Amino acid sequence: MTTTHDQTAAKIPKRVIWLAVAGAVGGFLFGFDSSVVNGAVDAIKDEFALSEAVTGFAVAVALLGCAAGAYLAGKIADRYGRIPAMKLGALLFLVSAIGTGFAFGVWDLIFWRLVGGLGIGLASVIAPAYISEISPRHVRGRLASLQQLAITTGIFAALLSDAVFATSAGGADQALWLGLEAWRWMFMAAAVPAVVYGWIAFTLPESPRFLVFQGKDEEALRVFKSIAPDEDSDRHLREIKKAIDEDKLAGQKGSLRGKALGLQPVVWIGIILSVLQQFVGINVIFYYSTTLWKAVGFQEKDSLTISVATAVTNILVTLVAIALVDRIGRRPIMLAGSIGMALSLGTMALAFGSATGSGDAISLPGAWGPAALVAANVFVISFGASWGPLVWVLLGEIFPSRIRARALGLAAAAQWIANFAITLSFPVMAAASLPLTYAMYALFAAASFFFVMFKVPETNGMSLEQAETLFVPKGSAKEAAKESAKESARA
């Protein structure tokens, strides 16, 4: 039987799809940048005669730039608009791609990586904010999930381009074109998506919700009608203006400050969601992937095949999330994902508890090798179909419009810092005890289940203004203002 919801959800305006895909290109830059360095890191280390510590910092410093860019993104987007923030992100990423390709020493390479990080941080915030603000409520989950799909596609594209350059030159450290080594071309290839993203930004309309906050109601109405002509644009405009009036009545301004340790409770919810997404260890789970695949017959030389297979898996499971998120909701998918991650990480902790040897010589006896391999892939599937895309969906819709960009920026900055902390701490923790490291990630996965269970309400099918009301504390000025507005309407 087809429900009314299904019938409505099937009608997605083509222009909305285009705008969401265009906005998600920032996620492609995010994924490309996070993966492109993998094919170049060994060549960079040899080129500049770097120590392990300096090499690690040169790779990870982009994450600090991302954190700074994400934090600044909210302020830039609220002051100048979502589209100018996109253009700035594209410009920074373009400059970084060219600068890194022509780096003459490790310190200017680090500088250009930092600049690129600023651009990626901007893009990581603006994409989910923009997509959520232009998407109809019945398909917002699917369209917002395009951010994660773009990230995984960017990772896949970077893996392929790295392989093409390295193979063509006979190695990442070998000269390819114009006397420049292949690793330099790997970074300069990022200029292509940066230019595309910048060009797209010049074709996109500004977020209608930002326009309303700027007092440009007529322009906002035109944007609403252009992106979804079958929707009730006047009603959307009234809902946004009503939310603004309620905020004014409650004396609330665009501040993140609150009584919960200095921040509003909803801001903490966004920060904790972001941190948990990283603290389950997704970015380091395949640190020993070669060992796992060797346990079932693969050779070390098959690492590219392994990486590509993982990237394709990420893309496919993200498509599953896109198909389900507006049908069954955010909470059920995230809760199921948390269970899958906790169980698979726990299995990996047990498997590595029986390991012999250390470092590259580590081995898993008997059935533990295949068990760990299966568990690692179950983890990737569980994460990719739930917490990977849906955290971005929630970050785009749980924050009130007056603070959305800044709150999303702070949450994304926390995510990048958590990513940096996990990336730097994993080698040290793994050397001390790999089983305990995976057990710690399993505990964070279990914690993610209870956090969603008790702190994250369902937002499926709601407008952004309706979703905002789910996070209003009882007895707050905002709630009082809403009740006052209702009484005035009755009178």
What are these regions (language model features)?
Residues 1-491:
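Transmembrane-helix signature of 12-pass secondary carriers
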